[in-house]
């Protein structure tokens, strides 16, 4: 299973996910409330360490944007509060999943992986919609043995 497939399947287990009728890759319909998407932004090599034998441990980080288009009318403070709570809830859920060790794993070492959902914010508004974005990152280690 690819990193994208893992993230997509895992996000679908969020208890509040049912608010999204569709969850796309690299797309979110900003005119239709109740959908979202995951936008992969790549892999970053954070650190590389080599031992005297040439074996290498790499700390990597995958980054994703999670976009959600939710219903919100102009001046609708109640709807805005519900949406903001949803954004906070998914961030707290990701944190809990990471801390309790039930988030998906990507590395091949016994080191604990860290998944973070951060900076959830209103991204854009449209006719009866509001698009929110959360930055998701996964930090993990991979070990490469020289044979």
Question: Language-model segments: which ranges?
Answer:
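Charged, amphipathic alpha-helical segments and their flanking helix caps
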Residues: 1-28, 46-147
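A short, hydrophobic beta-strand-centered structural micro-motif
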Residues: 33-43
């Amino acid at each position: 299973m690819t990193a994208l497939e893992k993230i997509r399947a895992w996000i679908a287990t969020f208890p509040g996910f049912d608010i999204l009728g569709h969850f796309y890759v690299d797309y979110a319909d900003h005119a239709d409330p109740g959908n979202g998407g995951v936008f992969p932004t790549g892999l970053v090599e954070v650190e590389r360490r080599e031992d005297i034998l040439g074996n290498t441990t790499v700390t990597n980080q995958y980054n994703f944007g999670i976009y959600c288009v939710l219903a919100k009318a102009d001046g609708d403070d109640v709807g805005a509060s519900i949406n903001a709570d949803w954004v906070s809830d998914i961030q707290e859920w990701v944190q809990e999943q990471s801390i309790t060790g039930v988030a998906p794993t990507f590395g091949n070492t016994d080191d604990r992986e860290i998944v973070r959902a951060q900076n959830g914010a209103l991204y854009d508004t449209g006719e009866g919609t509001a698009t929110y974005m959360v930055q998701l990152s996964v930090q993990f280690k991979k070990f490469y043995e020289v044979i």
